[in-house]
A protein has these predicted regions:
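Phosphate/NTP-binding elements of NTP-utilizing enzymes
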Residues: 2-151
Length: 151
């Protein structure tokens, strides 16, 4: 098992690690691909200051936001502060990265530290996906430095 982990991180599998998909895994994978809200509710984990690593329980407005992202290419959101927008966006970016081929995702913010925080949240959510859902390429990031994933 130690041979199948990436850079000593037991939450990440190495590239080209063979994973046996059960029929249940395939059904779940297809459900998640078609429904980003289902994916977020069932597979995305976030860090809570009070409880540590917890499942991401979306509020109804967050579900609507994710569905809007999924169904519309362009979105404008006029929303107040501290409503979980960043976490919601991270959950959708993770879905988008896993279930779409040949894509690039940029995380921009008014300060580099904020962009790095969002990238860190994305990394935590990815690391806590089941191994059968992790999509690994040969070029896996070694570390995050100055707003970039370094390979």
């Amino acid at each position: 098992m130690v041979d199948n982990v990436y850079l000593g991180n037991p939450n990440l599998k190495k590239a080209n690690t063979k994973i046996e998909f059960s029929e249940e895994n395939i059904i779940e994978f297809l459900k998640c691909k078609d429904d980003p809200v289902y994916f977020a509710k069932n597979y995305v984990k976030i860090v809570s200051l009070d409880e540590g690593l917890v499942p991401f329980n979306l509020y109804p407005f967050q579900e609507k936001l994710v569905n809007n992202f999924h169904n519309n290419r362009f979105n404008i959101c006029k929303m107040p502060r501290q409503t979980g927008k960043s976490t919601t966006v991270v959950s959708y970016l993770l879905h988008y990265a896993i279930f779409n081929d040949s894509i690039n995702i940029g995380i921009l913010a008014n300060k580099a530290k904020i962009a790095m925080d969002l990238l860190g949240r994305l990394q935590v959510a990815y690391e806590n996906l089941p191994k059968w859902m992790q999509q690994m390429s040969r070029r896996q990031p070694k570390k995050v430095r100055q707003n970039r994933l370094e390979y």
